[in-house]
Amino acid sequence: MRRGRAAAAPAPVTGEPNGSGGSKEIRFRGVRKRPWGRFAAEIRDPWKKTRVWLGTFDSAEDAARAYDAAARALRGPKAKTNFPLPYAHHHQFNQGHNPNNDPFVDSRFYPQDNPIISQRPTSSSMSSTVESFSGPRPPPAPRQQTTASSRKYTRSPPVVPDDCHSDCDSSSSVVDHGDCEKENDNDNDNIASSSFRKPLLFDLNLPPPMDDAGADDLHCTALCL
């Protein structure tokens, strides 16, 4: 009786996904293994044409997720990644994904982008088709009223001397102070000149003396003048 050789079943190829001792190693996009056992992740910037360092991780999966997050941030949802993005995460990414909130992305390479608010000018008809990207303009500061115009002073009626009321018209609403002052000055000058006038050398009520003829001639001459 001939003995047939039993066909040996092929042994399954086993190996760890991280490549820490198996015959076959799973390789991820953008991930390299370091000699000391850690995994480094990096990605190529399509705009700057340079490699961006993402960091060193303990496992290949963490490094691959960091690469996937950076690839979606640079190239959008159609970027080639290591792991497929679930529908829920894909919907959130389309709504608005911020790479700074991702724990696997270095925020130093992705600065925060401020939203740009467009504003249309309303003054000119030709500039109505051009959008202004300078952002909302601050409201103009309210104009401060001058203190001189804001303050109101009560005007007191002018003081008019008593002599002016007799000479000026009482029915007129405007009093000319200059004319009144001139008349008052003239009256004062007349009073001063009359009060300080030198007295005569003789009294006209008394008869002239008869003893001196020369004195009579003098008095007669004075009376004629």
Curated annotation (Swiss-Prot):
The keyword DNA-binding applies. It is found in: Nucleus. Residues 176-185 have a biased composition (Basic and acidic residues). InterPro entries: AP2/ERF_dom, AP2/ERF_dom_sf, DNA-bd_dom_sf. Its main location: nucleus. One of its GO terms (biological process) is ethylene-activated signaling pathway. A motif (EAR-like (transcriptional repression)) lies at residues 202-208. It comes from the Eukaryota. GO terms for molecular function: DNA binding; DNA-binding transcription factor activity. Keywords: DNA-binding, Ethylene signaling pathway, Nucleus, Plant defense, Repressor, Transcription, Transcription regulation. The AP2/ERF domain binds specifically to the 5'-GCCGCC-3' motif. The affinity of this binding is higher if the seventh amino-acid of this domain is basic. Contains a slightly degenerated ERF-associated amphiphilic repression (EAR) motif, which may be involved in the activity of transcriptional repression. Transcription factor that binds to the GCC-box pathogenesis-related promoter element. Involved in the regulation of gene expression by stress factors and by components of stress signal transduction pathways. Probably acts as a transcriptional repressor and may regulate other AtERFs. PANTHER family: AP2 DOMAIN CLASS TRANSCRIPTION FACTOR, ETHYLENE-RESPONSIVE TRANSCRIPTION FACTOR 3. Belongs to the ethylene-response factor family. Class 2 subfamily. This is Ethylene-responsive transcription factor 3.
